[in-house]
Amino acid sequence: QRGYQIQAFFCPDSVDTYLGDTPNVPRLMLGHSYWTTTPLSELRAMRCQLREALDKYNVGFWQSETCIMGNDEEIGGGHGFDRTMKTALYVARIIHHDIVYAGAKSWQWWRAIGGDYKDGLIREYTNDDLKDGRVEDSKLMWALGNYSRFIRPGAVRLSVSAFDQAGNLIPGGDTDQKGLMCSAYQNADGS
């Protein structure tokens, strides 16, 4: 909620910038998640704060761009293509938080193919003359593919709570780095 754009565009008191009654303009904000993923303690809090502002003005949210940056220290920053699960699970956690806590109805990645950086889902290797080369996939590509495959347009979220064996609510279990993050989905046909 940097710069109060939600309020500026959708609060009727913002006389110079209000768009809320403009025909054919959806009540929707798009945002990039750069520099909002670390430290982990702020990942959820920042998205909850965003959701609060969105709900206050009845505005939807699309997360319109994410890629690995230098501050993503948990996975070594953005340099060096990573074909392993480390980056894939890191990004899956970001997607989870954007959908669950910020209420993102759409989620986009930065780019599909790249060089020796973590922002490409596929690593390209080209010859010096740029006329030949090869490509290599990453686990990140498959993690994003699973979100695309199993969360379809029109899907809705259901609120679920986790409890321990004694029946006590487990607060914030999904932000525990050592804990298990679990999502379950039901298809339209009930399966």
Q: What is each residue range found by the language model?
A:
Residues 165-191:
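Carbohydrate-binding surface patches
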Residues 1-10, 151-152, 182, 189-191:
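Short intrinsically disordered, low-complexity coil segments enriched in acidic
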Residues 24-25, 142, 191:
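Generic detector of bulky aromatic hydrophobic side chains
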Residues 60-171:
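Aromatic/acidic polysaccharide-binding cleft in carbohydrate-active enzymes
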Residues 1-94, 101:
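Noncatalytic carbohydrate-binding groove/subsite architecture in carbohydrate-active enzymes
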